Amino acid sequence: MKIYISQELENGSDHWKKIFDSLESQRQEAGIRTIVVACEAENSNKMHCIMEIPSMDVVKEFMTRPENQEAMKNAGVKMEGRVMIPLAD
């Protein structure tokens, strides 16, 4: 299963990407694989990614872990604007 995620950032994509990359091993342990991650060409505060995931439940559980909530906050993710769309294969 794949998921599309779009979210607004407060501090730009470079700052966000450093923190995102630091969590790669935790994502791998959860069975989450990043396919593509990029910001918009004209807006470095708008991030998009597509990930391969075991299920929506796994992603939701991963994102609600306190340590990941803190990481997203530190990365400048605006939680209220996040879009998560499951994709058909």
Predicted feature locations:
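Short S/T/G/P-rich N-terminal loop/turn motif that feeds into the first structured element of a domain
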Residues: 1-69, 78-89
